[in-house]
Every structure is written in structure tokens, then in C-alpha cells.
């Protein structure tokens, strides 16, 4: 009986997180209140135990003995710009381009251990928290926190449970596109990261990831090896850290800088730079 009541409560919370259609005459007027309601609903889906010392110990060992060897089988990973993080004082907001479910473990593994242990990852409440078992798994393995990404539930100066986590000293990894790219180019960036950083006087660290879409494109739930050679090989994945940004100015300007960094690696930032070099160096 207790399980049934809990399941009913979770369903109601998810319904609120997804949002119900508002009447057209009241939609604009109700948007701020609706945003607060959705952020509150997302907070109720949170699993605080995932941030306990025991969960952190499990997570670090899982990263070391399971995730890293698994990623090494499918991809040759490289991180650049880590020296830019040496003088960064937490908490910080990490913003990255998004093309694959592989992005999160790749980014977390590239972070210095001290920074990684205090980093939470914003995850879509309507995607990762619909099923309680999935929610527990992603929260434990990646230290995720639920965020409502639709219909007025985006972040604002009052980000709800995200404000609390930042005040507690947690770093926050965000994907400002709100979803994975389907066409190989970054989509429009939402302003939430810059607004949240300015409200808390925090630094933003832009992160560019290349190669993950080839290893694990949208639609796949497991990585694959390269098949452009007789013997399947590893993909080339690179994580590049940009110059930290002080988000005290215009949010749109800050996010435009971030988008420029995402695009600075190539015409298509989600394609492996190693493959581009090989193509450029091959005879016509």
C-alpha cells in the first residue's frame, strides 16, 4: 500500500513537471508562477542521497574501475585546457555542448578529481526521472539533479534547489542547448546558466566536446567502435576547457561567447577533429 501511494505521488509530481496546457488568455500572466511551480516539482524528484559521502565513494570507484575502462575500449580520449581550471575557485558553473549521452561521463572523467567530486549534473526531469529505477541509477552514477527544461520551468534568478546546491558549494554541469544535437551543430543556447551564475556571482567554464556523437549518436544507448577500417577501431574524443568567464554582464552576451567557443574548433564541433585532419591530409 505504501508503494502504491508513493507511485501515485510520483506520478502527480511528474505531471506537474511536464506541465499542463495553460489557457491562452492567462498563459503570459501565469508564466513566472508556473516556472516556480515546475522548479518546485523538479526539486521533489531529486535524490539527495546521491550526494552523500557513501554515494560519492561508490561513484568514484565505478568511474575508475568500470566507466573509464569501458570508455577506453570504445574511444581514445584526450583533454586540453585543464590548466585553466587550476586557479578556479568553486563553486563554478560548467556549460558544455551536447551531442550524445556519452558527453557526461567523458566530461566528468576529464575534470580534476577535486572538482569532479563536488559536481552535480543537471538532467532533464521529463526524461531521466520518469522511471524511479532509472532516476536512482543516473543520480548515483553521475550525481544528477532533476531540472525542468520546458514550459516555463527553466532556470531563473531563483533556481530553487539549484540555488541551494550552489550555496552549499556544489559545482553545476549544464547543457544550455537543453537537448542533444541531431544535425551536428549546436542549437540555440538558453540563458539560464548565465542568469544563475550572475545571481550567485559565479564563474562559468565553457567546455567543448568533440567525437562523442560518432561513438554514441542520438538514438543509441550503447557506444560503438569505428567501422571505417577492416578492423573496428576506437573513436577519437576530445574535451576542451575554455577560459573561465565572469558572468556579471548581459546574459545573452555571455551565452554568445559560449556558443562561439563551441563553434571555434571546426565548422561542425561534434565531428572528431582527428577525422577532419585525416580528411584534410588525404589526396584528392
Residue ranges and their predicted role:
Residues 79-80, 145-149, 247:
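Short acidic-hydrophobic, aromatic-tinged amphipathic segments that line or gate anion-handling sites
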Residues 117, 133-139, 170-171, 182-253:
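A cross-family acyltransferase "interaction/gating" segment
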Residues 156-164:
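TIR-domain catalytic/interaction hotspot
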Residues 91-93, 169-175:
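Residue-level preference for the first positions of well-ordered beta-strands
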Residues 113-115:
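Short helix-capping segments at alpha-helix termini
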Residues 1-106, 117-119, 130-133, 140-143, ...:
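Membrane-anchoring hydrophobic helices of lipid-metabolizing enzymes
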Residues 73-80, 156, 187, 222-224:
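Short gly/ser/thr-rich secondary-structure transition/capping motifs
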Residues 120-126:
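Short internal beta-strands
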Amino acid at each position: 500500500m505504501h508503494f502504491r501511494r508513493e507511485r501515485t505521488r510520483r506520478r502527480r509530481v511528474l505531471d506537474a513537471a511536464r506541465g499542463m496546457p495553460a489557457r491562452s488568455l492567462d498563459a503570459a500572466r501565469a508564466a513566472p508562477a508556473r516556472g516556480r511551480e515546475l522548479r518546485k516539482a523538479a526539486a521533489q524528484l531529486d535524490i539527495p542521497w546521491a550526494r552523500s559521502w557513501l554515494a560519492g565513494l561508490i561513484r568514484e570507484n565505478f568511474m575508475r574501475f568500470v566507466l573509464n575502462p569501458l570508455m577506453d575500449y570504445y574511444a581514445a580520449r584526450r583533454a586540453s585546457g585543464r590548466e585553466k581550471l587550476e586557479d578556479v575557485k568553486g563553486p563554478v558553473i560548467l556549460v558544455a555542448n551536447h551531442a550524445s549521452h556519452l558527453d557526461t561521463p567523458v566530461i566528468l572523467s576529464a575534470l580534476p578529481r577535486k572538482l569532479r567530486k563536488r559536481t552535480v549534473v543537471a538532467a532533464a526531469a521529463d526524461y531521466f526521472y520518469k522511471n524511479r529505477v532509472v532516476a536512482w541509477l543516473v543520480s548515483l552514477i553521475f550525481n544528477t539533479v532533476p531540472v525542468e527544461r520546458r514550459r516555463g520551468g527553466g532556470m531563473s534568478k531563483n533556481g530553487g534547489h539549484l540555488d541551494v546546491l550552489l550555496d552549499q558549494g556544489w559545482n553545476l554541469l549544464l547543457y544550455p542547448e537543453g537537448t542533444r544535437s541531431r544535425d551536428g551543430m549546436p542549437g540555440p543556447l538558453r540563458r539560464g546558466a548565465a542568469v544563475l551564475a550572475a545571481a550567485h556571482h559565479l564563474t562559468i567554464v565553457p567546455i567543448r566536446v568533440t567525437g562523442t556523437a560518432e561513438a554514441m549518436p542520438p538514438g543509441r544507448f550503447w557506444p560503438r567502435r569505428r567501422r571505417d577500417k577492416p578492423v573496428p577501431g576506437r573513436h577519437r574524443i576530445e574535451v576542451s576547457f575554455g577560459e573561465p568567464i565572469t558572468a556579471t554582464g548581459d546574459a545573452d552576451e555571455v551565452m554568445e561567447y559560449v556558443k562561439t567557443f563551441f563553434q571555434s574548433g571546426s565548422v561542425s564541433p561534434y565531428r572528431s577533429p582527428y577525422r577532419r585532419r585525416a580528411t584534410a591530409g588525404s589526396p584528392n
